[in-house]
């Protein structure tokens, strides 16, 4: 199995639950669209030849960016705090250049200043302390290397999204009943949301 450096149940357990059920949803190889490919290269600042470069991906989820990085020729080390790392391992072709583990962004069991690129997309805002997570990642970038991160836009309009209104309630629910509830309410809500966006 994969090396694990964190408890099986942790603050990111709901992400593991989600990505193990919908393991291929965001993979370009599954959708046939270059969504993850384009987002990754835009974040890096343009497509680059990563052959031989050491890349650390933090918060890999089910592997949407891992798939792109693995195809780039880089030596990729990737981890997630949740059990989503199991979905990622299942989604990737075995390669001597791909290394996966379950670990903590605040306590990464790797040598500092040893990666050409450290990449963390769509993750920092989900940690208990985004600023500390950012500082932790920066320690693993080689001198002259690149730290690639992003975070959600923080503004008043974003706070009015239903997910933020409902989060205080859903946070207290067990993940299995919450998932079943979502399966029931989503089919009628999707057409209603599309209608309201016109």
Q: At which residue positions do the language-model features occur?
A:
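Active-site micro-motifs of SAM-dependent methyltransferase domains
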Residues: 107, 125, 154
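Repeat-solenoid scaffold signature
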Residues: 126-134, 149
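Conserved class I S-adenosyl-L-methionine
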Residues: 146-191
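Glycine-rich phosphate/pyrophosphate-binding loop
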Residues: 40, 190-198
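A short SAM/SAH-binding and catalytic strip from SAM-dependent methyltransferases
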Residues: 117-128
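Glycine-rich, histidine-containing beta strand-loop boundary motifs that form or position
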Residues: 80, 102, 122, 151-153
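A short glycine-rich, Lys/Arg-flanked "PGG" loop and its adjoining helix->strand segment in the class I
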Residues: 131-143
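Conserved N-terminal segment of class I S-adenosyl-L-methionine
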Residues: 2-111, 117
């Amino acid at each position: 199995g994969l090396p694990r450096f964190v408890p099986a149940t942790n603050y990111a357990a709901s992400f593991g639950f989600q990505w193990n059920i919908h393991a291929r949803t965001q993979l370009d190889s599954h959708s046939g669209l270059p969504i993850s490919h384009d987002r990754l290269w835009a974040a890096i600042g343009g497509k680059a030849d990563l052959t031989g470069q050491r890349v650390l991906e933090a918060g890999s989820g089910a592997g949407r960016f891992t798939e792109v990085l693995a195809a780039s020729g880089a030596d990729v080390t990737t981890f997630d705090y949740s059990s989503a790392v199991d979905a990622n391992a299942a989604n990737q072709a075995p390669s001597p250049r791909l290394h996966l583990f379950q670990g903590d962004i605040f306590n990464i069991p790797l040598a500092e200043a040893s990666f050409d690129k450290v990449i963390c997309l769509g993750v920092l805002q989900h940690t208990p302390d985004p600023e500390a997570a950012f500082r932790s990642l920066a320690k693993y970038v080689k001198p002259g290397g690149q730290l690639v991160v992003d975070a959600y836009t923080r503004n008043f309009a974003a706070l009015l999204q239903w997910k933020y209104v409902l989060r205080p309630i859903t946070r207290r629910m067990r993940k299995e009943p919450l998932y079943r509830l979502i399966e029931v309410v989503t089919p009628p809500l999707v057409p209603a949301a599309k209608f309201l966006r016109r």
